[in-house]
Amino acid sequence: MTSPSLNGSNSLVDAIRPETEAVSQAEMEAAVRTLLLGVGEDPEREGLLKTPKRVAEAYRFLTSGYSQSLDDLVNGAIFDEGHNEMVLVRDITAFSLCEHHMLPFMGKVHVAYIPNQKVVGLSKLARIVEMYSRRLQVQERLTRQIAESVQEILDPQGVAVVMEATHMCMVMRGVQKPGSWTVTSAMVGVFQEDQRTREEFLSLIRHQPAAFA
């Protein structure tokens, strides 16, 4: 299990931001056109005429997490409830792009924390997952960034994050192994230090919730 680094220059919360100037839509479209030529296609044929525009717009959306910040996302939705038992949001669907091949990986994220009196709006946990997923990623870093973010905004007694995902770079190319899943975890505070707390979390994410009537 992985413990993220939580302070100083090692912080991952705001890491991996593009430092180059914004590339224009036209430049992105030209790059897609070059890619089409590179794979032996004709960008002028009817079915591909709008492909450069569509691909550029799709990648802007799929990487829109670069333009978001944790402060703006949370927007003050932190409440002093005096609660000190585990809060778990499980089965958060996540889609991201592998930074090595820019192919999708997708799966579920489970996020838990034990408050230190303060709680955050539940939807914010899902939005944190979404923000970091919409960047070029590796699953290990994505898992750590989610844990770091919850730790940063709440300073809770502990944070636990588990992600289960399937990677298209292992399915569509390379070893070509459909059905393979990668599981990563980040445990902070009591989840790392106390075995019973960690086991409670792992038991809860394995348990199937009751069906919604």
Swiss-Prot record:
Highest taxon above the source species: Bacteria
An example Gene Ontology biological process: tetrahydrofolate biosynthetic process
Pathway info: Cofactor biosynthesis; 7,8-dihydroneopterin triphosphate biosynthesis; 7,8-dihydroneopterin triphosphate from GTP: step 1/1
EC nos: 3.5.4.16
Binding site for Zn(2+): C98, H101, C169
CDD domains, alphabetized: GTP_cyclohydro1
Name listed for the protein in its UniProt record: GTP cyclohydrolase 1
